Swiss-Prot record:
Keywords, sorted A to Z: Amino-acid biosynthesis, ATP-binding, Cytoplasm, Kinase, Nucleotide-binding, Threonine biosynthesis, Transferase
Function: Catalyzes the ATP-dependent phosphorylation of L-homoserine to L-homoserine phosphate.
GO cellular component, one term: cytoplasm
Taxonomy, superkingdom: Bacteria
HAMAP family membership: Homoser_kinase
Localization per record: Cytoplasm
Organism taxonomic ancestry: Bacteria, Pseudomonadati, Pseudomonadota, Gammaproteobacteria, Vibrionales
Main subcellular location: cytoplasm
Name of the protein: Homoserine kinase
Catalytic activity: L-homoserine + ATP = O-phospho-L-homoserine + ADP + H(+)
Length: 318
């Protein structure tokens, strides 16, 4: 029997937690904003099919696809446990634009590893699997980080801890918030977005960053949505990355005037997120972004909620 796993889009950083905070989101209208991976019995050790809206952006050689690397490291871990790897056929349905700031690579990695693990009756536990996901993300971006793979896999808002054998833990957030996600249809490379950042920061920025992040986490745990939203500020990346995102400053200004609680860059961009309390405000902001922030037919805007589930089985057939 095959298995199909869907892994949702995620917001790295959530503005206030550079490299240590991430949130999984899914559209309220039921659209699948994420990748799906099917694993079923095959005749050779590994074969790969690709499908989906952004299939043309994938490498033609299966061995250059990150899901092949996922299979390689999964096989390595099974070998350590003395468990036999089943011959399998994998299909990656690529629905996420690459270089979008929506955790596109994390979607493929999480869906592939979760599906591989389920197909083999879950020989790896959650932490072991998450560690592999971080390793794969590091292969793409040059450094192991979990701020997309953790929320994508586990759901909700995740805080990266990486102590006592704990990779990340969920932060209670506000179910009533709408998250408007706007992808303009242009590409920003994570490497370029990293290079633009300063190598050192001023003391007052470090203090502000600590206050905002601590304040946000405190407000989430004590149930203060207004305070939490006020704390969603970024002094680490946004001031420098804004110039890579045409129209971002105007979009943030409009969203605030329309009643949005906070607006920021999703991951390294170019996608932005805008948090709204009321659905009509979210829809008004979404309409404006569709007309003014989206630059071509590849761009899109979705009104989302937090995805509390993370990756999930959607059946056995794509």
């Amino acid at each position: 029997m095959g298995v199909v796993v869907y892994a949702p889009a995620s917001i790295g950083n959530v503005s206030v937690g550079f490299d240590v905070l991430g949130a999984a989101v899914s559209p309220v209208d039921g659209t699948l904003l994420g990748d799906r991976v099917q694993v079923k019995a095959g005749t050779e050790p590994f074969s790969l099919n690709t499908a989906g809206h952004f299939v043309s952006k994938l490498p033609t050689d299966p061995k250059e696809n990150i899901v092949y690397d996922c299979w390689v490291v999964f096989a390595r871990e099974l070998d350590k446990k003395g468990i036999e790897l089943k011959p399998l056929e994998m299909t990656l349905e690529k629905n996420m634009p690459i270089g979008s700031g929506l955790g596109s690579s994390a979607c493929s990695i999480v869906a592939a590893l979760d599906a591989l693990n389920r197909f083999h009756d879950q020989p790896l536990n959650e932490t072991e699997l998450l560690a592999l996901m971080g390793e794969m993300e590091g292969k793409i971006s040059g450094g192991i980080h979990y701020d997309n793979v953790a929320p994508c896999y586990l759901g909700g808002v995740q805080l990266m801890l990486e102590e006592l054998g704990i990779i990340s833990q969920e932060v209670p957030c506000f179910d009533e918030w709408y998250w408007v996600m706007a992808y303009p249809g242009i590409k920003v490379s994570t490497a370029e977005a990293r290079e633009i950042l300063p190598s050192q920061y001023r003391r007052q920025d470090i203090i502000a960053h600590g206050r905002h992040l601590a304040g946000f986490i405190h407000a989430c745990h004590s149930g203060q949505p207004e305070l939490a939203a006020k704390m969603i500020k970024d002094v680490i990346a946004e001031p420098y990355r804004e110039k890579l995102l045409p129209g971002f400053a105007n979009a943030r200004q409009y969203a605030a005037s329309a009643g949005a609680l906070a607006t920021g860059i999703s991951g390294s961009g170019p996608t932005l997120f805008s948090i709204c309390k009321q659905k009509d405000v979210a829809e008004r902001v979404a309409r404006w972004l569709e007309q003014n922030y989206v630059q071509n037919e590849e761009g899109f805007v979705h009104v989302c909620r937090l995805d509390k589930q993370g990756s999930k089985v959607t059946g056995s057939e794509l």
